[in-house]
Amino acid sequence: MGPLINRCKKILLPTTVPPATMRIWLLGGLLPFLLLLSGLQRPTEGSEVAIKIDFDFAPGSFDDQYQGCSKQVMEKLTQGDYFTKDIEAQKNYFRMWQKAHLAWLNQGKVLPQNMTTTHAVAILFYTLNSNVHSDFTRAMASVARTPQQYERSFHFKYLHYYLTSAIQLLRKDSIMENGTLCYEVHYRTKDVHFNAYTGATIRFGQFLSTSLLKEEAQEFGNQTLFTIFTCLGAPVQYFSLKKEVLIPPYELFKVINMSYHPRGDWLQLRSTGNLSTYNCQLLKASSKKCIPDPIAIASLSFLTSVIIFSKSRV
């Protein structure tokens, strides 16, 4: 399947995909939990759903995989001093980055192949700070939709690149060492309920920190539990000291099982490919050249956009 969007020619592909999109906001939520769903049934007039639906806006989740431009982006991040620009734009981030850096140095470990200290610190910076997680996810959902907006308003260029690169490098390292391609992990969200159906395709449009521990998915109580079979996520316990797998925002999943209960729901998801809207956005922001968008590996009936604000935890 070719790219869903060819920005150079401004043509939508394929033409059989209906332009239906919607944004859903859970009432009373605080922390953004971005999901992109395809195949989700639209609510009917009689359905009782505690959400607000807006059919006017696309989500714009920033999901760059840096396909074919990883080295160039790394060089530009350094040359443009984007680390300083990003850190100075966020309150207390420099202190938190220093703390994450010190935590890595104190572990005294050897870096995995092809990884740098910055990769390790980026993982700790993200996984150890809930404020960073919240701010980062919110920014990915709203302020990187065009190259110009990305350059001007997205102050997580450095973190996004190094988290994405770290996941990709760790996957290669894991495959070379033990041949492990996929992981069964668990994730739960508090005070959130989802309505999907078996066979629907779902995408978490954010970096999702999940647990390898099965007991994490056994505590019911007004929450949604996910059992996820990820094939693009990477284990980060070597850095965070927790049995975690970090799932990238561009991985697609199919809902293969589910159950609903008054005090807790459960969904079982299986990896089914990847989907990115953006590619090499940093280079596009500083160049007039047309850089190809990424190829989407997926079969979608239509793409429905959903943004959910909630409290979530592993």
Swiss-Prot record:
GO cellular component terms listed in the entry, alphabetical order: extracellular region; plasma membrane; side of membrane
The keyword Transcription belongs to this UniProt entry's keyword annotation: no
Pfam family, one: ART
Localization annotation: Cell membrane
SUPFAM superfamilies: ADP-ribosylation (SSF56399)
Cystine pairings recorded for this chain: C69-C280, C182-C231
InterPro entries: ADP-ribosyltransferase_ARG, ART
Molecular-function annotations in GO: NAD+ poly-ADP-ribosyltransferase activity; NAD+-protein-arginine ADP-ribosyltransferase activity; nucleotidyltransferase activity
Signal peptide: 1-46
Sites where a glycan is attached: N114, N178, N222, N257, N274
PROSITE patterns attached to this UniProt entry: ART, TR_MART
Keywords: Blood group antigen, Cell membrane, Disulfide bond, Glycoprotein, Glycosyltransferase, GPI-anchor, Lipoprotein, Membrane, NAD, NADP, Nucleotidyltransferase, Signal, Transferase
Family: Belongs to the Arg-specific ADP-ribosyltransferase family.
Descriptive protein name: Ecto-ADP-ribosyltransferase 4
Gene: ART4
